[in-house]
């Protein structure tokens, strides 16, 4: 390969990592619940991106394409023998360094919500993570998961139905 083309490809990868690296890491972390594994998976995601960059046709948004790779890599990890344990909800969100009571209560609420989300079936958990935490639209979530928009809407609706009584029971309300 021409060294100039290789530099261009590396520059594109660097720009993608700069813009989306943290977002991909967060999504993967939310899916697998282990910081070290999430970092490894994120690295694998960007290796795949580098290898596939020339084949990206632009039929979907670059963020959707990246998230699809991240979701697939995370699913592969969760199916593997490397992942055979339950993780605590406290590992889902970064721990706050402050000790203000209000922030502690807010953190506890986030952890409880995260624990409830992680208790959902995988199909519902994925759409919640991509739609709410990942900030993808219905269309982008459908593309990332390789399902129809209707399936995403149905899964979101059913996930909310399952979460509502759990949130009320935990005293976290429902808006």
What are these regions (language model features)?
Residues 127-131:
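A short pre-motif secondary-structure segment
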Residues 17, 25, 35-52:
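Conserved RNAP core-binding helix
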Residues 71, 145-169:
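DNA-recognition helix of helix-turn-helix
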Residues 84-115, 137:
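Internal acidic/polar
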Residues 40-47, 60-72:
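Structural recognition of an alpha-helix C-terminal capping motif at a helix-to-coil junction
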Residues 55-57, 68-89, 106, 158, ...:
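Arg/Lys-rich amphipathic alpha helix in sigma70-family domain 2
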Residues 1-23, 30, 109-113, 118, ...:
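N-terminal module of bacterial RNA polymerase sigma factors
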Residues 6, 46-61, 81:
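Sigma70-family region 2
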């Amino acid at each position: 390969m021409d060294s100039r083309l290789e530099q261009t490809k590396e520059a594109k990868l660097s720009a993608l990592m700069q813009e989306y690296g943290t977002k991909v890491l967060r999504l993967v972390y939310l899916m697998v619940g282990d910081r070290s594994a999430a970092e490894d998976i994120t690295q694998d995601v960007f290796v795949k991106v580098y290898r596939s960059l020339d084949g990206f046709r632009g039929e979907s948004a670059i963020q959707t394409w990246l998230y699809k790779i991240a979701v697939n890599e995370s699913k592969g990890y969760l199916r593997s023998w490397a992942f055979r344990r339950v993780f605590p909800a406290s590992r889902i969100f970064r721990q706050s360094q402050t000790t203000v009571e209000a922030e502690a209560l807010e953190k506890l609420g986030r952890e409880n919500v995260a624990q409830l989300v992680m208790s959902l079936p995988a199909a519902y958990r994925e759409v919640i993570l991509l739609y709410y935490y990942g900030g993808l639209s219905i269309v982008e979530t459908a593309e990332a998961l390789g399902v129809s928009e209707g399936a995403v809407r149905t899964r979101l609706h059913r996930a909310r139905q399952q979460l509502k009584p759990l949130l009320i029971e935990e005293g976290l309300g429902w808006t």
